[in-house]
């Protein structure tokens, strides 16, 4: 799969284009006198060095672009790479099956767990079918149904957050979008099983929070978590979405800032260039963090789990 480079990655893109051209020439004529392999190796080293330099000094807006990268791994990619025997479950048993939320039972190193996550979709038809990862009320009600099932069978719950926000359409509001989100917040705080939440891309507002109340909250290195998108904030404060980069910096949407504010527990490092550069390595790091979190939570009693979760929620907003 050819990489899709963002605007700030254009110097890297130019180097990679040269590498591809030289590689293509080498394949066409293996009898060339010049040593193309040596030049390709030199350019690859230069590309890695340049990538490292650019990614060492990313701003919040650049991180937001990475969090939305079209090739970034989604929930089902991590399910495939980090879990076994996934059995998807569908429907909220009240209205419909919302494809923007996926969930089901899987095994993590042999242990049954309940997985719930946003799913955006890749191709145009799938994006539309999954509503670009923006759940309707039935999506959140499906998520809650699966959480309650996990509680009945004493299975840990693992959620993956990646949404621009809950769907704001008229139909969603008529079917009780705000009530569905509020109910999830309340019920997740009361669950008797461990809950681990990880932001893998965009963590957009209440749409993210509705599956984001947990005992452990993690973020991938180049993910974001905020009450509104940078464009939305800029449109309100400056009446122009063009001010989105300024808004992104002001809102503190990136993982280091959120960890500093004690809103998250861990930052999971991404491969050089972002998770989309090496999904397998990213999935391995994510899996290791989940196993570590489960080991920490397994030693706690049900009362301790719930008390810690409550204290965590009550601490939000205090310096």
From Swiss-Prot:
The keyword Cell inner membrane does not apply. It is an enzyme of class 2 (transferase). The keyword RNA-binding does not apply. Residues 35-296 form the CoA carboxyltransferase C-terminal domain. One of its GO terms (molecular function) is acetyl-CoA carboxylase activity. GO terms for biological process: fatty acid biosynthetic process; malonyl-CoA biosynthetic process; response to antibiotic. Signal peptide: none annotated. Pathway: Lipid metabolism; malonyl-CoA biosynthesis; malonyl-CoA from acetyl-CoA: step 1/1. InterPro entries: Acetyl_CoA_COase_a_su, ClpP/crotonase-like_dom_sf, COA_CT_C. Pfam families: ACCA. GO terms for cellular component: acetyl-CoA carboxylase complex. It catalyses: N(6)-carboxybiotinyl-L-lysyl-[protein] + acetyl-CoA = N(6)-biotinyl-L-lysyl-[protein] + malonyl-CoA. Its EC number is 2.1.3.15. Keywords: Antibiotic resistance, ATP-binding, Cytoplasm, Fatty acid biosynthesis, Fatty acid metabolism, Lipid biosynthesis, Lipid metabolism, Nucleotide-binding, Transferase. SUPFAM superfamilies: ClpP/crotonase (SSF52096). It is found in: Cytoplasm. Component of the acetyl coenzyme A carboxylase (ACC) complex. First, biotin carboxylase catalyzes the carboxylation of biotin on its carrier protein (BCCP) and then the CO(2) group is transferred by the carboxyltransferase to acetyl-CoA to form malonyl-CoA. Belongs to the AccA family. Acetyl-CoA carboxylase is a heterohexamer composed of biotin carboxyl carrier protein (AccB), biotin carboxylase (AccC) and two subunits each of ACCase subunit alpha (AccA) and ACCase subunit beta (AccD). This is Acetyl-coenzyme A carboxylase carboxyl transferase subunit alpha.
């Amino acid at each position: 799969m050819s990489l899709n480079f963002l605007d700030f990655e254009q110097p890297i893109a130019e180097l990679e284009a040269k590498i591809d051209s030289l590689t293509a020439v080498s394949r066409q004529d293996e009898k060339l006198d010049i040593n193309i392999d040596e030049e390709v190796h030199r350019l690859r080293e230069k590309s890695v060095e340049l990538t490292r330099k650019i990614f060492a000094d990313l701003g919040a807006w650049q991180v937001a672009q990475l969090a939305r990268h079209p090739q970034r791994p989604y929930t089902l990619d991590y399910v495939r790479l980090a879990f076994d025997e996934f059995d998807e479950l569908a429907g909220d048993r009240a209205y419909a099956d919302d494809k923007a939320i996926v969930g089901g039972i899987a095994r993590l190193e042999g242990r049954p767990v309940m997985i719930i996550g946003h799913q955006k979709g890749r191709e145009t038809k799938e994006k539309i079918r999954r509503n670009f990862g923006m759940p309707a009320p039935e999506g959140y009600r499906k998520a809650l149904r699966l959480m309650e099932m996990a509680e009945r069978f004493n299975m840990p719950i693992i959620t993956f957050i990646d949404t621009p926000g809950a769907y704001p359409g008229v139909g969603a509001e008529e079917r009780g979008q705000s009530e569905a989100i509020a109910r999830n917040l309340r019920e997740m705080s009361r669950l008797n099983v461990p809950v681990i939440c990880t932001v893998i891309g965009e963590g957009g507002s209440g749409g993210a929070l509705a599956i984001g109340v947990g005992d452990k909250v993690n973020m991938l290195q180049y993910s974001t978590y905020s009450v509104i998108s940078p464009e939305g904030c800029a449109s309100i404060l400056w009446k122009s979405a063009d001010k989105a980069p300024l808004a992104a910096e002001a809102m503190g949407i990136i993982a280091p800032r959120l960890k500093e504010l004690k809103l998250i527990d861990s930052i999971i490092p991404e491969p050089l260039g972002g998770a989309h550069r090496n999904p397998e390595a990213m999935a391995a790091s994510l899996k290791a963090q989940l196993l570590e979190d489960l080991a920490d939570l397994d030693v706690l009693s049900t009362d301790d789990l719930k008390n810690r979760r409550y204290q965590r929620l009550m601490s939000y907003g205090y310096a």
